[in-house]
């Protein structure tokens, strides 16, 4: 008789990672879902039902938010919320803040940094080293969005599959697989969550192209969607951690218990490099009225 291993799955994607000018304060977002295999499958089925009912074939993406799919996107977010609150599903988001400036190594490319961040994200964000010990062992299948760089794909897979050793958890096996987010509604919902955070945090609704007055219809729509997602996350946080205040752009505490890295339903992590300089130029008081960067102000 085959022993039943405790099976978990992680889905993760990244957004706002490319340094397209002008730069934004909050960038390098990583968003992911963790859950037991059966609950992740249940979430997938529920999201797919919504997709079929709305009959919208276009990929779910923050950049695709429109009047036509607004209700569809909100339903997907509601569905994720329901599964987080009622089943074994968790959401994790990590990002960087340019107010904490890291001087890159001379030969370090953007992809190198992205690779290192992905590693940190999977290693620390889901608290997998705190997975309850199962007599039959545990397996974690990590599904990442198919990456552009083959060099980093293989390296990242090797690094991540060695994590149970780093965690001193020989009872855990971890496997990494890559999938195309265009075919994965779960990864697409992560894109919505990250897109909303980046839009809201970087105050895109304040931008006024060519000195126009007021928001464009697209800005109004995106702000409405971002606020909807913000309220959803805030509600989950209040329900599951009993927290009164919620900040989308600060790290979630662990209340003195490191197992909460795994136990919490929702966690946010502002990744601050151990070696950094404070750049006050990126703090809200020093941005212009449209939320744009003006100049460096290193402490």
Regions found by a protein language model. Give the residues of each.
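Phosphate-ester processing/binding pockets and catalytic centers
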Residues: 1-299
């Amino acid at each position: 008789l085959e022993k039943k291993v405790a099976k978990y799955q992680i889905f993760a994607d990244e957004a706002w990672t490319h340094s397209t000018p002008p730069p934004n304060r909050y960038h390098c977002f990583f968003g992911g879902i963790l859950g037991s295999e059966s609950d992740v499958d249940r979430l997938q089925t529920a999201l797919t039902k919504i997709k079929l009912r709305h009959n919208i074939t276009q990929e779910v993406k923050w950049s695709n938010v429109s009047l036509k799919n607004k209700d569809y996107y909100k339903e997907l977010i509601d569905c994720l919320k329901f599964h987080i609150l009622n089943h074994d599903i968790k959401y994790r988001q990590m990002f960087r803040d340019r107010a904490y400036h890291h001087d890159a190594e001379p030969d370090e490319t953007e992809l190198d940094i992205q690779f290192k961040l992905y590693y940190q994200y999977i290693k620390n964000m889901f608290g997998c080293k705190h997975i309850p010990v199962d007599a039959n062992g545990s397996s974690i299948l990590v599904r990442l969005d198919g990456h552009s760089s083959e060099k980093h794909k293989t390296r990242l897979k090797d690094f991540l599959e060695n994590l149970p050793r780093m965690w001193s958890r020989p009872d855990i096996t971890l496997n990494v697989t890559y999938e195309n987010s265009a075919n994965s509604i779960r990864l697409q919902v992560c894109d919505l969550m990250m897109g909303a955070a980046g839009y809201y945090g970087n105050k895109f609704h304040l931008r006024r192209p060519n000195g126009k007055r007021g928001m464009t219809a697209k800005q109004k729509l995106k702000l409405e969607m971002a606020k909807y997602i913000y309220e959803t996350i805030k509600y989950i946080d209040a329900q599951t951690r009993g927290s009164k205040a919620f900040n989308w752009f600060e790290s979630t505490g662990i209340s003195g218990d490191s197992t909460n890295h795994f136990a919490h339903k929702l966690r946010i992590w502002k990744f601050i490099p151990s070696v950094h300089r404070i750049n006050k130029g990126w703090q809200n008081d020093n941005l212009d009225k449209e939320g744009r960067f003006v100049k460096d102000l290193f402490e």
